[in-house]
Design a protein with these regions (language model features):
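Domain-scale recognition of soluble eukaryotic interaction modules
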Residues: 69-109, 128, 139-141, 156-246
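Active-site-proximal segments of catalytic enzyme domains
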Residues: 114-117, 157
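Short, solvent-exposed beta-strand/turn "edge" segments of beta-rich domains on protein surfaces
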Residues: 116-119, 131-138
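Short, hydrophobic/aromatic-rich segments at coil-to-beta transitions
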Residues: 121-126
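Short, charged/polar surface micro-motifs in flexible loops or helix N-caps
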Residues: 132-134, 148-154
Length: 246
């Protein structure tokens, strides 16, 4: 047991969560090794935009729910890892532009959208989109990972969902079929405008070119069934701000 406790003390947050899933004994050892305050810190390091609407008593459960809601554990693990050599303040145009964009997010964000950088190089951002009213995503808060290339704004950011969502234009992995970040990028576009375009997809899917053909077929031909499944996914994966851990 002492050896395991020593090993656990060197693991990162995702590895600790994975270890706790191995068996009940390991779950108990992780619980003894990691305090509630540490799980609180782990949660806000991974999800700085998370805002629970209740008094959290057990942060390990909140962390576990958020991890379970992620479509890709590997991507989650890498989402706020600063790239080696990334902190090079040489691209002043990029840095100034991103600084201005973040300032706007802080002072006058688009309705239902938030974003914040995760690293010093401004290469990894987390964003959140509130599910639009009267859509099957209403009531949900969906997290996204935004990766900014060193050549931004010449090249577009990479944007993917970090919360599972049932949608024709969003793959099971979280990839988004959005024209403005794939083929029609423009210097006039910003992170905020891209996220607004993503938000609009939640009310108006484009099924002619879908990331998930079976979901698009359901949306077109079995709308009631689609809405029911999308609402179920929203309730299960995108309401961690109100869903208490079991």
């Amino acid at each position: 047991m002492a050896v395991l406790m020593q090993v656990f003390s060197h693991l990162d947050d995702i590895s600790l969560w994975s270890a706790s899933k191995v068996c009940k004994r390991w779950q108990q050892l992780v619980a003894e090794c990691i305090t509630n305050d540490q799980w609180n810190q782990f949660t806000f390091r991974r999800w700085p935009l998370f805002r629970p609407n209740y008094a959290v008593a057990e942060w390990a459960g909140v962390f576990a729910n958020l991890v379970d809601s992620s479509p890709c554990l590997y991507c989650l693990h890498r989402s706020n890892v600063e790239e080696e050599g990334a902190w090079e303040p040489s691209n002043h145009w990029r840095n100034n532009r991103l600084c201005n964009e973040w300032r706007i997010f802080c002072t006058d964000p688009p309705e239902g959208i938030r974003a914040t950088p995760l690293d010093r190089a401004w290469s990894h951002w987390q964003a959140s989109i509130t599910g639009p009213t009267s859509s099957p995503y209403e009531g949900g808060v969906f997290y996204l990972h935004v990766q900014i290339p060193h050549s931004y704004p010449i090249r577009p950011p990479s944007v993917r969902f970090a919360t599972k969502i049932f949608h024709p234009n969003i793959s099971r992995h979280g990839d988004i079929g959005l024209d403005c970040i794939q083929h029609n990028w423009s210097l006039a576009l910003t992170i905020a405008k891209v996220l607004i375009s993503v938000q609009s997809l939640l009310t108006d899917p484009f099924c002619a070119v879908a990331m998930e053909a079976d979901v698009a077929e359901m949306y077109i031909n079995k709308r009631a069934r689609f809405n029911a499944v999308a609402r179920n996914w929203t309730s299960k994966y995108a309401m961690n701000d109100i869903r208490r851990p079991c």
